[in-house]
Amino acid sequence: MRHRNSNRKLNRTSSHRQAMLRNMANSLLRHEIIKTTLPKAKELRRVAEPLITLGKDATLANRRLAFSRLRDRDIVGKLFNELGPRYQTRNGGYLRILKCGFRVGDNAPMALVELVDRPELATDGEVVTAE
């Protein structure tokens, strides 16, 4: 019986799943947009959104908690110095999951995961804010 089991197993052991979600959260916070399968994207949302909420309050305890979950100093710095202030007025809903077709090899549903209100790059490489 699967009563009260709230997360997807994704055909991985618990340590592999934890490492994969940690790496995906690091990639998302670094690049602000990633492409992955739809079930992984939905699980990533459960990991990444609380981290961004944590980044809105830059205390030492929150930095240590974020580092224990991400294990990357550069990403923790970006989380508290750049992403936290950016989403200070937003109460949740920091990620957008867009379905983008199916993968060629196995027909798995794919999705783009991106941060809402991220600055978009123009064609000439300048940063343009999203309207």
From Swiss-Prot:
InterPro entries documented for this protein: Ribosomal_bL17, Ribosomal_bL17_CS, Ribosomal_bL17_sf
Keyword Cell cycle: no
Keyword Mitochondrion: no
Any one of the GO CC terms: cytosolic large ribosomal subunit
Domain of life: Bacteria
GO biological process: translation
Gene3D superfamilies: Ribosomal protein L17
Gene Ontology terms, MF aspect: structural constituent of ribosome
Pfam families: Ribosomal_L17 (PF01196)
Keyword set, alphabetical order: Ribonucleoprotein, Ribosomal protein
Known partners and oligomeric status: Part of the 50S ribosomal subunit. Contacts protein L32.
Entries under HAMAP family matching the protein: Ribosomal_bL17 (MF_01368)
Family: Belongs to the bacterial ribosomal protein bL17 family.
Protein name: Large ribosomal subunit protein bL17
Source organism per UniProt: Methylobacillus flagellatus (strain ATCC 51484 / DSM 6875 / VKM B-1610 / KT)
